[in-house]
Amino acid sequence: MAFGALLALSAALGLPTGPTCTYDASTATVQAQMVSARTVVGNAGDGRILVDGRVCGTLAQTRQIVVASAFPPGTDTVVVDERHGRLAEPSSMRRPKVFALTGTGGDTMEVIGTAGRDRYVAYNDLGASIDLDADRAPDFVSTDVGRIVLRGMAGDDVLSDGRSGHDRLACGPGLDTVRAGSGNTVTGCERSLPRRHP
């Protein structure tokens, strides 16, 4: 049965259509299979990892989160949502690395910030990657991505994207600093420093 037909049948029968996820203790890995074109990974606010609202592991035990897609190229969006807390183990602030295995195409990586000060930096390596904690090491990596969206929320954020193209940087309340590559869209920002790298 085709994947799309399986989704339609699940919806008709009232079966859950959220992501399927497993935790592999031997590799400390959460594995999530996308069953819609947009998947959100976040912190429940208490150290549990949520994928589209379902508990899939804990930040204390998980070293990596792998999100895989079965959708056509260019249609996937994988979101790291930090509105309920950083996607990091609370005592050490150690982050699991998030891998978005979306295949080829112009897929989207998106980050939604915390209520405090955030520093997110997008890079053009390994397909595309985003540093979520200013340590110069990517925390969110995609195999092939056409667009990155960085959303600052409250707090004085630093959003930096040296990639040129179709990315979007959206600021929230606070005094934000933005460094955007040529061709990127910047919205809602009080202060913008275009085309400068961190």
Located regions from the model:
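Acidic, glycine-rich low-complexity segments
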Residues: 11-198
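Secretory targeting and sorting signals
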Residues: 1-14
